[in-house]
Amino acid sequence: ERLDREYNQTIITTVPNVEYQVHKTDGTMVLVDNPSQMPPLGNIDYITEPYIKAQIITPTDYMGNIMKLANDRRGIFISTNYLSTSKVDLIFEFPLSEIIFDFHDKMKSLSKGYASLDYEFIDYRKSDLVKLDILLNNEPVDALSSIVHRSNSFEYGRKLCTKLKQLIPRQMFEIVIQGAIGAKIIS
């Protein structure tokens, strides 16, 4: 609101995305930072995503909660270093896409504000990623599409469809809300 009022700038809020490297079956590679740019599933050989090395410093009382959060976000545990009897330094490797959305907020919430996060880019790694399309009345809605790990796709699609069901006002006709990967309906 302030940006609009003071600088006459309108803002569009979107979900944060990272840049994926999509290696196609013809040997070429394209950079994709938006699900709408994803090539058809049959043309994809493999996809790589950016990984980061994260250093999380937290009181030892919250270490278990932070470890669970990291595990839920596909974190790869590297090491633990006790800085004192009450503070621990945890090192993880994460896909960047797993921490850019709400990881920091959840980490702060789980540690009552005491944990801190620092990270740096490592490299791109091969991952089992898919494009999740949200269909309304069998028509894909590009703004709701996302690139997710296959292991999280069903749960993420179900949550998104349930949320849409709650948000879309009732109509005189039925609106079908579905999540799909390629031609396969998953939710």
Predicted segments with their positions:
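Accessory interaction regions appended to the cores of large information-processing enzymes
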Residues: 1-187
